[in-house]
Amino acid sequence: MDIRQLCGNAGVASVKMAALSGEVKNNALMKIADALLANSKRIIEANQHDLERSEKENLASPLLKRLKFDEKKINDVVEGIKSLMALEEPIGKTLLANKLDDELELYKVTCPIGVIGIIFESRPDALVQISTLCLKSGNCVLLKGGSEAKETNRVLTGVIEEATVAAGLPKGWIGLLESRDDVNEMLKMDQFIDLIIPRGSNDFVRYIMDNSRIPVMGHADGICHVYVDESADLEMAKKITVDSKTQYVAVCNATETLLVDRAVAKEFLPGLKAELDKKNVEIFGDEETADIIEVKPASDQDWATEYLDYIISIKIVAGMDEAIKHIITYGSGHTDCIVTKDKAKAVNFMNLVDSGNVFWNASTRFSDGFKYGFGAEVGISTSKLHARGPVGLDGLLSYKYMLIGNGQIVDDYATNKRQFKHERMNKQIDEI
């Protein structure tokens, strides 16, 4: 099937998807969960082929870790689907109700975006999370995963499509693209596709934006920071730093740079290094850091690097203002944390750091749709428009205005025969 037909089919299916009941969608989600478990052997075999091929092609270790889709990860995504089913139905929610006049009522109501094209890295679990979120939100989805996972993605897409069509979803609601040429062709299909979500480097996201007329929701690098303030609880700071860096290194919310206030650096860094050494973390540092602990010399490139590995860069700063300046210069707008006992400083940091997720005394690894209670996420948006931070169900919704009248015409108001009331109502659209 060519890409134009794939996109056209999704456009047709989007009309039916928008009208599906919550019951039908939840039943389809349950069918996906059952099908993943029933086909786990076939899925793991396909994934093993991808892993073996990628190892021969010398794929980096962190990327191999992302690529692996074993029984544990299958069970994890199944649990994620069940959590998604437990969330309330997102479509048809009344966001606002205004009484314009007697028997003239305006409702702002949630609805699907339509057809979403999502380009993501070599993480098969992401394919399941993305497709199920789109299903729950009533959207059609066109998927392009990393080529390293091509066999796994084919099997997963087939399993999901077969299970959901049997459950009553329209054919064509999900589609898989397999090449860069497919992506370039998809970017031209603005008559069918309503939104593109690219997950990858800043350069990649910029390329997508520059080569498409379709709106783009950016998901770029995760250059995350922890700043240890002079008033921090240093034991807490150590725990947060180690968790932020090492709990799972191959993800975009892992910390890459640690900023330490000069006033506590000599007391804090030796103990931190001992903990990082236990995890075999490679440490790069500026000259001041090197005077305190043994590190490799850091360059400007280190401050701008998303390692996705057991590597961290450390810089000593004069205080919070310098830390914020560093984050503004080198950060990606993803997740940044301050560790401090000083509430005023924490509030100031969270207000001034212009990232989608800003934390006080908590690991950067918390910036995740599942951990936020969103069910799952299609990615972390570093854009400021429409959706920001972990993009869950709410980020995949639009809204429409529904006006319910009884023969009213504008001329009556223009000639002062009638007057607008413009009263806020505590009423839902399904109560009309």
UniProtKB/Swiss-Prot annotation:
PROSITE patterns reported in the protein's UniProt record: PROA (PS01223)
Pathway as given in its UniProt record: Amino-acid biosynthesis; L-proline biosynthesis; L-glutamate 5-semialdehyde from L-glutamate: step 2/2
Domain of life: Bacteria
GO biological process: L-proline biosynthetic process
Disulfide bonds: none
Keywords of the record: Amino-acid biosynthesis, Cytoplasm, NADP, Oxidoreductase, Proline biosynthesis
Broad class of the protein's primary localization: cytoplasm
GO terms under cellular component: cytoplasm
EC assignment: 1.2.1.41
Catalytic activities: L-glutamate 5-semialdehyde + phosphate + NADP(+) = L-glutamyl 5-phosphate + NADPH + H(+)
Database matches in Pfam families: Aldedh
Entry's localization field: Cytoplasm
Recorded GO MF terms: glutamate-5-semialdehyde dehydrogenase activity; NADP binding
Function: Catalyzes the NADPH-dependent reduction of L-glutamate 5-phosphate into L-glutamate 5-semialdehyde and phosphate. The product spontaneously undergoes cyclization to form 1-pyrroline-5-carboxylate.
PANTHER family hit by this protein: DELTA-1-PYRROLINE-5-CARBOXYLATE SYNTHASE, GLUTAMATE SEMIALDEHYDE DEHYDROGENASE
Stored NCBIfam families: PRK00197.1, proA
Family: Belongs to the gamma-glutamyl phosphate reductase family.
UniProt protein name: Gamma-glutamyl phosphate reductase
